């Protein structure tokens, strides 16, 4: 049980850290600049440069994946915090019953 609590605490802290990163104006500006630059270079890329287009597409997908990973960490952290809150608020009788069963 304590392993689960420790893991939940770590996930909750990691989620809070990820949320601070996502909410940071500097991060938001940097990600927007990155995405805008990728789209601009993609638009400027000659049609015959198929390899360059593929690389830019991969870079665009990678940028979105990175943001998605951070968002996933935030959501996992929120769920972990809800689980910790539920364990904390659980009655003593229910805790005893859960240990017996």
Question: What residues fall within each predicted segment?
Answer:
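Intrinsic-disorder/low-complexity detector
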Residues: 2-101
């Amino acid at each position: 049980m304590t392993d689960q609590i420790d893991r939940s605490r770590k996930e909750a802290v990691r989620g809070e850290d990820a949320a601070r990163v996502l909410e940071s104006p500097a991060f938001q500006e940097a990600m927007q600049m990155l995405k805008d630059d990728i789209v601009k270079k993609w638009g400027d890329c000659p049609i015959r440069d198929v390899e360059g287009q593929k690389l830019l597409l991969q870079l665009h997908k990678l940028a979105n994946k990175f943001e998605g990973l951070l968002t996933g960490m935030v959501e996992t952290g929120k769920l972990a915090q809800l689980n910790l809150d539920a364990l904390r608020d659980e009655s003593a009788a229910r805790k005893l019953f859960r240990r017996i069963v």
